[in-house]
Amino acid sequence: MRPAALLLLPSLLALLVHGLSLEAPTEGEGQAPGLEEMDGELTAAPTPEQPEPGVHFVTTAPTLKLLNHHPLLEEFLQEGQEKDELRPDPPTASPLPRLANQDSRPVFTSPTPVMVAAPTQPQSREGPWSLESEPPALRITVALPPGPGMAVPTPGPGERPNTPPPSGAWTPTPEGPGDIGRPWAPGVMSQTTGLGMEGTVATSTASGDDEETTSTSTIITTAVTTVQPPGPCSWNFSGPEGSLDSPTASNSPPDVGLDCFYYISVYPGYGVEIKVQNISLREGETVTVEGLGGPDPLPLANQSFLLRGQVIRSPTHQAALRFQSLPPPAGPGTFHFHYQAYLLSCHFPRRPAYGAVTVTSLHPGGSARFRCATGYQLKGARLLTCLNATQPFWDSQEPVCIAACGGVIRNATTGRIVSPGFPGNYSNNLTCHWLLEAPEGQRLHLHFEKVSLAEDDDRLIIRNGDNVEAPPVYDSYEVEYLPIEGLLSSSRHFFVELSTDSSGVAAGMALRYEAFQQGHCYEPFVKYGNFSSSAPSYPVGTTVEFSCDPGYTLEQGSIIIECVDPHDPQWNETEPACRAVCSGETTDSAGVVLSPNWPEPYGRGQDCIWGVHVEEDKRIMLDVRVLRIGTGDVLTFYDGDDLTARVLGQYSGPRGHFKLFTSMADVTIQFQSDPGASVLGYQQGFVIHFFEVPRNDTCPELPEIPNGWKSPSQPELVHGTVVTYQCYPGYQVVGSSVLMCQWDLTWSEDLPSCQRVTSCLDPGDVEHSRRLISSPKFPVGATVQYICDQGFVLTGSALLTCHDRQASSPKWSDRTPKCLLEQLKPCHGLSAPENGARSPEKRLHPAGATVHFSCAPGYVLKGQASIKCVPGHPSHWSDPPPICRAASLDGFYSGRSLDVAKVPAASSTLDAAHLAAAIFLPLVAMALLVGGVYLYFCRLQGNSPLQLPRTRPRPYDRITVESAFDNPTYETGSLSFAGDERI
């Protein structure tokens, strides 16, 4: 067999094994060990080809003994329950298409076959991640970087590889480098690539030509040798938390930059949270973070947004980080990230119209319960449960509340019944019956909120009884106008019947009912308004006062009504009605302007004008929240008090939310509807909120602050004005004390405040010292003690105490001390010894200085040759000063034998004069001694033996024995002369 065939043999074997694994998967493939069967169905992820029957949901999630389980969003849930209407989060895709009622959710599929490695125990930096029940591994496919054995183009020297890694599939296993992160290896992530291997095999097997086979083998060999495997620079993490560290320079191939991948996979139902603990990149290096688990990677962040302390969250349980560095020696940079798993949650469910929702938890296992208002029925599941998955989701779609066609309402106290589809149009061929039954001993009252029937055979009948045979008290066939005062039942029942034919539709009807006791008036009602009463049960004598919501006006009734007639209690006036009228004037500082008859459709051919007026030094902000008018209708805003003022804006047709600001204290609003336009539907018109605001050429007026005052730089708060806030003694400014009016007419900072000072300011450190503090925040009573370093002296008080002062802020008991270099007194200069010298010749010597002493020739130094000025208070010499004594014969003969002096070096050779002095000086001394004795005896006897002439004797001192010279000439060692300090 040729060498080329030998090279081709491993490739053929690998392809054969791969093909077998794809065609005939082994038993249990794609199913993790420990995967159990529930309700006759496996918990493995389904495929897109499988249908979506309403089967029992089975999940791979364990019971909710979860790691890193954060507290539930209690505050968020409470806030959401208090709101009337909540916006749902945007729907997120689920990777489990077989779960019940997931009709509209996209399906995440694997683009390539996956070979699942056997799972092992997951590891992390913190130790093993263990659960009570081992979770099965899910099959997940994402893009994989090139690995060993994959042929990719090799960048040239200095060229940076910036192409994305080839598409592939990888399977994160529970085993991973959660503790330190281990390099990627083919055993961890199986992949298939489009390398053209199949074509190569076909060519080599189909042809018997050896030359062709050799050529093919050469091509394959060349492709493999050009690979720059990034194996040491790719890691797979599967623990619940860990660290991502930048690779070292040793990981970088020669002349090629690094292209590193960090793959993170946590347990489904958790997301990946990455925190930037440190990052320092070189110019040209990139770091990208993506969320995985969907059909396409989700970009989360790159090096432009990665700052220290930043937190990035992936909405799925997989994430990837890619680091690309420059070739050596420029790179690589450094970074240190920490990741951890966090519990994912379902989105907040949408509140149904005419209903409410109550949520226990948004995390897996939580539930949402729905209910509808009276007169509406729930269509859909009443209870939803949050299921654990790659992205948690509700087990069903949110229900809706629809108006029921008929029904029995027993113990009816207060509520409403509406026609099917209300406030929209009802459908054809309806026959609906409602039976209202009040509690025992009470009667019913009906208010007509709205009745709109088609002008044909559609009919509304209200009967004073409990069946279709009861006498009618209202029949739409016979009554043209609705009774403003409503209807009263003679017993505890009302029977309502609505029938429609096969042609024509309308909005239908809305009736409000109230039950009331005998001897009392019924509860009044005003649509789009409120009322206050003097008694909650409305007995005789009760008074009620009505008011309308902003934008509405009271009509057709009295503002105050009273319950009268004890025998047959009733209101002395009918309840008023609140309607949105065409035109009006207002001087309120805030309010609402509504289209005529809102929320009902406005009429055709209307021309309405509203005027809004505020104080002269104020301006008006118009907040147009709803604008749904016909294309032939016109809404115009004038910046003034009449139609000749400047036009702020003119609009036709529907438009989104926007705002307008006036330059005057007045605004005029004109609405003109098209006479020939068709009738619009419900909630067609406009809603405009207006507010009084400060002048729009100045910043808003700043208020005074307690315990302080403000000082503006000029009276008018125009652009550039500076306002300075100061506090009274004993208080300090919290926040910025200087605010500036900016170009956008807003203040540069938030309003500060004055806070009572209860602590002293930090006195600070003292140079060349250390301090001991009793409390780090320096409250009243705290102490600070300063201790100087060695060689320094404290000047001032060493102990400071924080004292409270009623009239001002707390203050330290003394000023901060100082540590000065210790100044020591010098030593006084010593006189040179007699027959000797000292060096240096100074009058004063600083502490630490040294003085050297020496003797003249023929004298010996007794004492220390060098003494030092010892620092102190006061400074003193280390030893007494030495003296120079003359040499003596005793010293010369002190030795038991004469030691011949060693000849010194050539530099210290004795000259002849010194040698003569050393010999004759003792002789002279002896002669003087003999002469002295002689003269003594001669004087004692009165005459001289030598008969010398008498002369006046000269005085002389008595020579004592101490005057004898010691002779050091023959001492062992060198001879001692002036300047030699040794004896």
From Swiss-Prot:
<feature type="signal peptide">
    <location>
        <begin position="1"/>
        <end position="19"/>
    </location>
</feature>
<dbReference type="GO" id="GO:0043197">
    <property type="term" value="C:dendritic spine"/>
</dbReference>
<feature type="disulfide bond">
    <location>
        <begin position="582"/>
        <end position="608"/>
    </location>
</feature>
<feature type="domain" description="Sushi 3">
    <location>
        <begin position="697"/>
        <end position="756"/>
    </location>
</feature>
<keyword id="KW-0325">Glycoprotein</keyword>
<feature type="disulfide bond">
    <location>
        <begin position="727"/>
        <end position="754"/>
    </location>
</feature>
<dbReference type="InterPro" id="IPR035914">
    <property type="entry name" value="Sperma_CUB_dom_sf"/>
</dbReference>
<feature type="glycosylation site" description="N-linked (GlcNAc...) asparagine">
    <location>
        <position position="388"/>
    </location>
</feature>
<feature type="disulfide bond">
    <location>
        <begin position="788"/>
        <end position="819"/>
    </location>
</feature>
<keyword id="KW-0812">Transmembrane</keyword>
<feature type="domain" description="Sushi 1">
    <location>
        <begin position="344"/>
        <end position="403"/>
    </location>
</feature>
<feature type="domain" description="Sushi 2">
    <location>
        <begin position="519"/>
        <end position="580"/>
    </location>
</feature>
<dbReference type="GO" id="GO:0005783">
    <property type="term" value="C:endoplasmic reticulum"/>
</dbReference>
<feature type="domain" description="CUB 2">
    <location>
        <begin position="582"/>
        <end position="693"/>
    </location>
</feature>
<dbReference type="GO" id="GO:0043198">
    <property type="term" value="C:dendritic shaft"/>
</dbReference>
<feature type="disulfide bond">
    <location>
        <begin position="855"/>
        <end position="884"/>
    </location>
</feature>
<feature type="domain" description="CUB 1">
    <location>
        <begin position="405"/>
        <end position="516"/>
    </location>
</feature>
<dbReference type="Pfam" id="PF00431">
    <property type="entry name" value="CUB"/>
</dbReference>
<dbReference type="GO" id="GO:0005886">
    <property type="term" value="C:plasma membrane"/>
</dbReference>
<keyword id="KW-0732">Signal</keyword>
<feature type="disulfide bond">
    <location>
        <begin position="548"/>
        <end position="578"/>
    </location>
</feature>
<keyword id="KW-0768">Sushi</keyword>
<keyword id="KW-0677">Repeat</keyword>
<feature type="disulfide bond">
    <location>
        <begin position="699"/>
        <end position="741"/>
    </location>
</feature>
<keyword id="KW-1133">Transmembrane helix</keyword>
<feature type="disulfide bond">
    <location>
        <begin position="346"/>
        <end position="386"/>
    </location>
</feature>
<feature type="glycosylation site" description="N-linked (GlcNAc...) asparagine">
    <location>
        <position position="530"/>
    </location>
</feature>
<feature type="domain" description="Sushi 5">
    <location>
        <begin position="825"/>
        <end position="886"/>
    </location>
</feature>
<feature type="disulfide bond">
    <location>
        <begin position="521"/>
        <end position="563"/>
    </location>
</feature>
<keyword id="KW-0472">Membrane</keyword>
<feature type="glycosylation site" description="N-linked (GlcNAc...) asparagine">
    <location>
        <position position="278"/>
    </location>
</feature>
<dbReference type="InterPro" id="IPR051277">
    <property type="entry name" value="SEZ6_CSMD_C4BPB_Regulators"/>
</dbReference>
<dbReference type="GO" id="GO:0043025">
    <property type="term" value="C:neuronal cell body"/>
</dbReference>
<keyword id="KW-1003">Cell membrane</keyword>
<feature type="transmembrane region" description="Helical">
    <location>
        <begin position="915"/>
        <end position="935"/>
    </location>
</feature>
<feature type="domain" description="Sushi 4">
    <location>
        <begin position="758"/>
        <end position="821"/>
    </location>
</feature>
<comment type="similarity">
    <text>Belongs to the SEZ6 family.</text>
</comment>
<feature type="region of interest" description="Disordered">
    <location>
        <begin position="148"/>
        <end position="194"/>
    </location>
</feature>
<dbReference type="GO" id="GO:0050773">
    <property type="term" value="P:regulation of dendrite development"/>
</dbReference>
<keyword id="KW-1015">Disulfide bond</keyword>
<dbReference type="Pfam" id="PF00084">
    <property type="entry name" value="Sushi"/>
</dbReference>
<feature type="disulfide bond">
    <location>
        <begin position="827"/>
        <end position="869"/>
    </location>
</feature>
